[in-house]
């Protein structure tokens, strides 16, 4: 009997831990961390301090988890109204809103403290600004009131590379703001592809996402426009900023070409949810691989290999007889 009670208590404890973990929407966080890490690698010329990297990513994780938890508290009414989200911790009754608020505050305080003590004040303030912008501007002011909610609100998701850059340098350069702009421009096609998939859910709770207000065809047209803007804009890191080189250029060309192709497919069939799902999934892969390209391009080893290839080519050219 005692053993059974212990097992039950352990199971209940694990269920509580799982519920609080779910409040943070953990599937969203890795992409934010990847953009943070990419900025740190570029800012450090491929020689980022591993301890600084780990501390910054941990602080970023805590800040993002706090923001998502606060979002769950604010949106508990629409989460309960939608069948897809009714099982989330707060609408299902597994976590009380007050307890979730305390949890979110603890996460934010830990994040801020970690940044201030082990990184710098600039990164700490930027991380907190991300939480504030996400909650006040996107969640409170825009999400339920404007079909342009994700366009402006996307700035919150664009802050992580600023945090990463500031963690390394203590300030922000044009390259840091270029990374911010790339993610800002990428967010609408990424999120609207998702909104096309779950349009009915948003309509049910009167959230004016673009597909609900303007319809699928207009939304896809906007996705097409933003894609045609963001893909060429990614090359600003190469010229004129010279923050990235040939490896990143090749990666951005291939990934951008596929991004445009998938958006074009959806443009031909704007009502096709499978194509919207395919674009949504690819947009995640696109950003992950684009950031990976930034990291690889920044490494000293990459520069040495490119220089060696260039020297070998020059040697071969010099051996060609001229007549």
From Swiss-Prot:
Keywords annotated in UniProt: Cell inner membrane, Cell membrane, Heme biosynthesis, Membrane, Transferase, Transmembrane, Transmembrane helix
Compartment(s) of residence: Cell inner membrane
GO biological-process terms attached to the record: heme O biosynthetic process
Catalytic activity as recorded in UniProt: heme b + (2E,6E)-farnesyl diphosphate + H2O = Fe(II)-heme o + diphosphate
Statement: the UniProt record of this protein carries the keyword ATP-binding: no
Alphabetized InterPro entries for the sequence: Protohaem_IX_farnesylTrfase (IPR006369), UbiA_prenyltransferase (IPR000537), UbiA_prenylTrfase_CS (IPR030470), UbiA_sf (IPR044878)
Principal location: membrane
Domain of life: Bacteria
Protein's name according to its UniProt entry: Protoheme IX farnesyltransferase
């Amino acid at each position: 009997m005692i053993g059974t009670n212990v097992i039950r208590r352990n199971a209940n404890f694990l269920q509580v831990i799982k519920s609080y973990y779910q409040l943070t929407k953990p599937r969203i966080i890795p992409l934010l961390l990847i953009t943070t890490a990419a900025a740190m690698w570029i800012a450090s010329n491929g020689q980022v301090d591993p301890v600084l990297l780990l501390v910054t990513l941990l602080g970023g994780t805590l800040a993002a988890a706090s923001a998502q938890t606060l979002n769950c508290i604010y949106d508990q009414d629409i989460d309960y109204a939608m069948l897809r989200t009714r099982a989330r911790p707060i609408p299902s009754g597994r976590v009380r809103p007050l307890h979730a608020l305390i949890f979110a505050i603890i996460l934010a305080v830990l994040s801020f403290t970690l940044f201030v003590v082990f990184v710098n004040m600039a990164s700490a303030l930027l991380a907190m600004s991300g939480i504030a912008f996400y909650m006040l501007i996107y969640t409170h002011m825009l999400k339920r009131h404007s079909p342009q909610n994700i366009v402006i609100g996307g700035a919150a998701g664009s802050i992580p590379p600023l945090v990463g850059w500031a963690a390394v340098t203590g300030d922000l350069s044009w390259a840091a703001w270029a990374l911010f702009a790339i993610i800002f421009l990428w967010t609408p096609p990424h999120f609207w592809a998702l909104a096309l998939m779950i349009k009915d859910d948003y309509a049910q709770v009167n959230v004016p996402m673009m597909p609900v207000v303007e319809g699928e065809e207009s939304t896809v047209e906007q996705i097409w426009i933003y894609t045609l803007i963001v893909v060429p804009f990614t090359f600003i890191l190469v010229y004129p900023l010279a923050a990235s080189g040939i490896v990143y250029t090749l990666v951005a060309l291939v990934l951008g070409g596929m991004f445009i192709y998938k958006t074009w497919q959806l443009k031909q069939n704007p009502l096709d949810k499978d194509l919207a799902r395919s674009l949504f999934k690819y947009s995640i892969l696109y950003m992950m691989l684009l950031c990976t390209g930034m990291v690889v391009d920044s490494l000293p080893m990459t520069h040495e290999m490119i220089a060696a290839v260039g020297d070998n080519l020059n040697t071969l050219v010099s051996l060609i007889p001229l007549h």
